[in-house]
């Protein structure tokens, strides 16, 4: 059977695409997923269902690709969690439903992607959500994804303290972090009503499963896209040790920021010299495949907590965050600070000390990493390096964020909560150089991988897809996931990725929609 559309990867984008494209009964859709599928809530494991647990991120979890990557020159390779299940990373994430900033999308448009300015993407953000707290022109009321913020009287002690401390330092209160002029400290919008992690498998795909024109296949590894000349015609897949070919009129890669560029390179689309060196026949040279790897570096300031302070987190995932603009920065809200308990029986993260950490995320880093093929074997992961904090401006902003955390901890709101600082030590704080060394040794990462198949016009030599997700130089092949974001957003990327999938699905489905499908 030849499908009209094959979607590779049932993650946050893939589930949306499959659900939307199959709304047309004349369009046959095959959704492929390497991980397991749980088609109803009753069979969904608790590690995926409940937002208070991060067990599915563990390296030994069957729902995690459990990749390893390089983060800085002073650290050993780190574990990188990526969802391997229908629902993708949205099925194992922290349930933050925070949009990119207005300026993020205006930058996309300025870089030659004029269909992605803020006014053009706002309707898709609105249509995909039902905001349970705010009713205005910037928020939706009839979408499939519930969005809510925890009311102040329900905030746990350590979350409320961050809010009070930030206000004491003069930062404004931010009642709506998804508003166009947001900034300051407030409750983060979440997509976990009653503590349930609402991935797009639940919000989009499940309601479409009954359609006869939609086929969902789990535990299927995509090995490569097959091309006839420079036209995609199918996907080579593997299941149960056997290799098969499935044919499609259009192939869409939605395998994520690491797996989509990996599949492109295995398919002969990418840096020509590198592919030839691996013995892969070249379909089309695109030097940007795997480059421009963007994410959010995170530094953690840890503090010991007094006896009697409740460190059991709210099982509904309450989160308070401070977003601000670093000194001398021209990019608004380029730092985010959050706080949470490290000691957490609910999440399975139990340490002997009573500890909390302030997490400082660099939301718009200047530096970028890259991804390369390590093997032609599709079972072997690609090699990737975040190259965090190699840029002086990135280090400068992170130093400032760490020092701000120390000032927050000194405020009255924390007097009855904290007893002592654990890290960084006084020695780590003795100078800029010492703090830089500590940061390079300890910095962590978010799971917001972006940019490795970035969108842009054909005149951009590093662009991999055009603004409609179509791979430059290869017919009937698209990439639709976080990898096509030109830069990481100044927010968790989950909401933006869903918006991107909704928008491109509409283009594909429309009669004038830049596709072989009409």
Regions found by a protein language model. Give the residues of each.
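N-terminal redox-cofactor-binding region of secreted/periplasmic oxidoreductases
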Residues: 1-518
